[in-house]
Amino acid sequence: MRNNVIQALFDSLPSNGIGAVRYNFRGVGNSAGKHGNGELEVLDSQAAFTFASQLVQNIPVFSVGYSFGADVSLAADHKHLAGWIGIASPLALIEPEEMKAGLDDRPTLLLVPENDQFRSTEEARTICEPWVATSLEELAGADHFFLGFTQPVVNRTTSFIAEFVGQG
């Protein structure tokens, strides 16, 4: 939760008219519990989606995750989710074929840094080729940590959500 990507999104989305809820997974920061290797963290995500959907009725909820959080985000599902955005997802911590986002007709955006140290764009494209309703976009010049590249992440996340919220 305390990194440049999540902080930039949390600071920028509300000023673009998009609400944001951020949370730590179990065992991170002041959160209780033990790390669950992704499986238990999916439950944390689903609880966060329930919370977000109860804040304001009939508002689309998008799951946005970065790095490990992206894998968890893409694996989690909830009846109120409108779609998924995975930022620098390793596509390895949870089996990609088990990720709900890849099996669903709701929209999914994968933002892959051109110079990601953990998963190349071509590897990500190959892994996600069978996914439905999924767009994969490379962010030129960025590496996995997006130092100096958070604004393109914020811009594309905002525009992707706006595309689908504007349809409803």
Residue ranges of model-derived segments:
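Short alpha-helix in the alpha/beta-hydrolase fold that links the catalytic acid
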Residues: 98-99, 106, 119-129
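Short beta-strand/loop motif that positions the catalytic acidic residue
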Residues: 103-105, 109-112, 116
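Catalytic histidine-centered segment of alpha/beta-hydrolase-like enzymes
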Residues: 33, 142-154
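Acidic catalytic loop of the alpha/beta-hydrolase fold
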Residues: 114-119, 144-145
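Catalytic histidine neighborhood in serine/cysteine hydrolases
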Residues: 129-145
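Alpha/beta-hydrolase active-site loop signature
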Residues: 25-29, 91, 143
